[in-house]
Structure formats: structure tokens, C-alpha cells
A protein has these predicted regions:
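Generic "edge-of-domain/loop-turn" microfeature
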Residues: 26-29, 65, 91, 156, ...
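A generic signature of intrinsically disordered, low-complexity regions enriched in glycine/proline
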Residues: 11, 65-66, 187
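Terminal accessory/targeting
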Residues: 1-57, 73-82, 205-262
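Catalytic domains of cell-wall/extracellular-matrix polysaccharide-remodeling enzymes
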Residues: 115-233, 237-238, 242-257
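Active-site beta->alpha N-cap acidic-glycine motif
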Residues: 33-122, 126-140, 145, 231, ...
Length: 262
């Protein structure tokens, strides 16, 4: 009888251990395959062996548009590199602007093809497919294959372990922001308000990832940009474009749910 009890206990214990291992796999996979810069980090480490005290990433979503072209003029005058998260459907008719972004050394990221929230957030598969579609179009035009992405509206409440693991399997890296001009929800904000918003850094003050937009109605963003650049330059920040070597930055998410990886 004691022998049977011991066998039952052994089998039960083995099942529990296997279950726990399967549950934590996605989390371990993410940790091993991702270098993540979170809002709570106190320092930012480059892909090299040295630490940079202050970094600023100027990022523009929703292009390419005519406004993108004007922004590029400002960036060229200021000798600053930025990153543009491209919406696939906006490329048609703006191929030369996309080429200019690439030729002038700016970062190019993916911002889905349709920017249709109901469609892209229907499933992880749909989301990944839209990123791939936009990446393929950009590759045809520039010869480069972007792998950095940004969620329309940000990853908060949309990213989980399952989705992140699938993105990493496709070599995509996620980048949110910790400075928000609020020019997406309100493109008509005054230039002075946009400049004020650009100075509010959430989390690690040594790294500013600034969210801006380059829709056709973001003319005030263009006007504010020189002052934003001057502000961070005066504070000693170094301007960089996001590349595949830049540590990921995405908002924290709960790992208790959606842990099954197919």
C-alpha cells in the first residue's frame, strides 16, 4: 500500500513540475532573447561595452506624407537623425519621400499597413502579417528590411507574452515611447504646448524616446521641432535613430495570461 502511495505521489509531483515548466517557458524565452529598456531602468546601455549618459530618439509615426518631407528638411539643417514608423498604405505616391528617409540615414520602422485598429488587433497573426506586408514594400523601394515596429496607439493593453514571442520569432522588435507630444490626438495644439509636452520624460530621464506624428495636419509639429532639438541639445543629449541594435522599449504587461505558445 505504501509503495502504491509513493508511486502516486511521484507521478503527481512530476505532472506539477512539467506544468510549471510549460507555463514559464514563454517568459524565459522572452528574457533570454530580449534586451529590454523599461521605464524603471536607471541607465541605458548601448549595444557596445560603454554606457551613454543621455540619449534622445526623435520618432515620427504615420508617414510618409508631405509633412514628412518638410520634417526631413529640418532634420537635415539640424544635422540630426530620427526614426520614422511607416504606415504601408501611405507609401503609394510617396515613394521618393521614403527613399529620402533611407538615403539620409534615418531609421525606418513599421507601423502596420492599414493602421485600422479593428483589423490589426483582431489577432496576432493579422498584426504580424500587416508588419510583414509593409516591410516587403519598403524593401522593394529601399533595399532594406525593417524589423523595428511600433504598435498603433502603443503596446499598452495589447502586448502579452504570446504576441511578443511571435513577434520575436519573426525578428521584430517593439518600441514604445516615454515622451508624448500629444500631436496625434490633437494635431492643432499650439507650438508652445508641443514644446512643453516634449520636455516631460516619464521614467528614466537619461533616455527620451519622443513620440511625434507626421500626418498632413501636423504642421505645428514641424514648427516646434527646432526648439525641441535645441532643448535636448542644450541638455547634452545625443541624438540617435532607432536600429535593430537598440534595446527594446515596451510597456510592462501581465504574464499570468496568454502564456501558451503555439
Amino acid at each position: 500500500l505504501n509503495f502504491k502511495k509513493k508511486n502516486i505521489l511521484f507521478v503527481f509531483t512530476t505532472i506539477i513540475i512539467c506544468f510549471l515548466f510549460a507555463s514559464i517557458y514563454p517568459i524565459n524565452y522572452i528574457k533570454k532573447n530580449t534586451q529590454v529598456f523599461t521605464p524603471l531602468n536607471t541607465s541605458f546601455k548601448d549595444s557596445g561595452d560603454y554606457k551613454i549618459s543621455k540619449y534622445v530618439y526623435l520618432t515620427f509615426d504615420d508617414g510618409p506624407t508631405i509633412v514628412t518631407d518638410v520634417l526631413l528638411d529640418v532634420l537635415k539643417t539640424e544635422n540630426v537623425r530620427a526614426t520614422f514608423f511607416i504606415v504601408g498604405k501611405e507609401i503609394v505616391g510617396n515613394e521618393l519621400i521614403l527613399k529620402r528617409i533611407y538615403n539620409e540615414g534615418h531609421g525606418i520602422g513599421l507601423h502596420t499597413y492599414s493602421h485600422n485598429f479593428k483589423k490589426i488587433y483582431r489577432s496576432t497573426e493579422e498584426f504580424v502579417n500587416e508588419m510583414k506586408k509593409t516591410s516587403n514594400i519598403i524593401e522593394e523601394i529601399t533595399g532594406s528590411t525593417p524589423k523595428i515596429i511600433r504598435f498603433p496607439g502603443g503596446s499598452s493593453k495589447r502586448l502579452n507574452a504570446f504576441t511578443l514571442t511571435n513577434l520575436h520569432k519573426n525578428n521584430f522588435k517593439v518600441y514604445d515611447w516615454n515622451v508624448n507630444l500629444c500631436d496625434g490626438v490633437n494635431p492643432n495644439l499650439s507650438v508652445s504646448q508641443l514644446i512643453k509636452n516634449s520636455k516631460i520624460i516619464k521614467g528614466n530621464k537619461n533616455v527620451a524616446i519622443i513620440l511625434m506624428h507626421c500626418n498632413s495636419n501636423n504642421k505645428n509639429t514641424v514648427k516646434a521641432l527646432p526648439c525641441i532639438i535645441k532643448h535636448y541639445r542644450d541638455l547634452g543629449y545625443e541624438f540617435r535613430a532607432i536600429t535593430e541594435n537598440t534595446p527594446e522599449y515596451y510597456y510592462k504587461f501581465k504574464t499570468e495570461k496568454n502564456l501558451t505558445v503555439k
